Every structure is written in structure tokens, then in C-alpha cells.
Design a protein with these regions (language model features):
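Pepsin/retropepsin-fold aspartyl endopeptidases
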Residues: 6-163
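Cationic, low-complexity basic patches in intrinsically disordered or flexible, solvent-exposed regions
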Residues: 3
Length: 163
């Protein structure tokens, strides 16, 4: 097929229509839609509830585990246990951690009751956010949740889909 502007427009319209129907296709496949916001720092902010308590989180595909700061122990009623694992990320390494197992996580209408959380000092994350006047977060929703929920991120429409 010879390439011309008509073919380019047709290809664009075809892919746009496919994206437009994405929500309907995923809904039929039992995916739940969760909206997120993009901050000035290009982080994806998402609202979640842990053990029935609401919080603000960064959605981070590069974080292997979901985590909360130490203040989250009381806030989310976590049963924290000491851990030998050291955390690293966002410019900090070798940080002391604790673990909290079998927590309930709810992201809009999607939920799980077996979420293990890493607990560590998130002050470096929130300090970086505050430099851009972005509100602090309670934690990070990581790849563990995305994998468990077979996550699909629609960056254009600011939606996460979980099954």
C-alpha cells in the first residue's frame, strides 16, 4: 500500500477509535476503572483506602512493592513487624524497613485483601514533592498491585484499569 496523507489520517482515526473504545472493552472484561491525576512533577497521584482508611498515593510502575511511611502504621491501623530488608529508591538507599501483611486495599471499586506493605521513611519523597508545592503522600502503589490486578494504564485519559 502506497503511503499518503489519507492513509495516515485513516490510521490515526482507526487507532483513536480503538482507544475511544478501550474503556468499554475493559469494562466487559471485568476491569475496574480508577482515575488518577498527574502532578507538576509528572507523578501519578491516586486515591486509595488501606484497611478502610483513605490516603493519597503515588502510582509508581518502577516501585517493586507498595509502601507507606512510618506514620502510616497508626493512620492505616497496620500490624507492623520488623524486617531485615533495606529499602532504596528516589535517591535514598539502605533504609530501615518494617512489613505489614494481609492488608485490605481499595482503589475505587477494585479491591484486594492480601496486600503486603513495606513501611519506611518517606520523608525524602514528600520533601521533594513539597519543593514543587505538591501535597505530601501517604505512600506508593507499586508494581505488586499492578501485577496482581493485571493493570493497564491509560495515560491519555488518566485512568488505571485493574481486574
Amino acid at each position: 500500500m502506497k503511503h499518503n496523507s489519507y492513509n495516515t489520517i485513516f490510521t490515526f482515526q482507526k487507532s483513536f477509535l480503538t482507544m475511544k473504545n478501550l474503556h468499554e472493552k475493559l469494562k466487559k472484561a471485568d476491569y475496574k476503572k480508577v482515575k488518577f491525576k498527574v502532578t507538576k512533577t509528572q507523578h501519578l497521584l491516586i486515591k486509595a483506602a488501606i484497611n478502610g482508611v483513605k490516603g493519597n498515593f503515588i502510582l509508581d510502575t518502577g516501585a517493586s512493592n507498595s509502601c507507606v511511611g512510618f506514620e502510616g502504621i497508626d493512620h492505616f491501623a497496620l500490624k507492623a513487624e520488623n524486617s531485615k530488608t533495606k529499602a532504596s529508591g528516589a535517591g535514598a538507599t539502605g533504609m530501615f524497613t518494617q512489613m505489614a501483611s494481609n492488608n485490605k486495599l481499595k482503589l475505587d471499586k477494585w479491591k484486594t485483601s492480601k496486600l503486603d506493605l513495606v513501611i519506611f521513611d518517606l520523608s525524602h519523597v514528600n520533601e521533594a514533592l513539597s519543593q514543587y508545592k505538591v501535597k505530601p503522600v501517604h505512600g506508593i502503589i507499586g508494581a505488586d498491585v499492578l501485577l496482581k490486578g493485571k493493570g493497564i494504564i491509560d495515560y491519555f485519559n488518566h485512568c488505571l484499569y485493574l481486574k
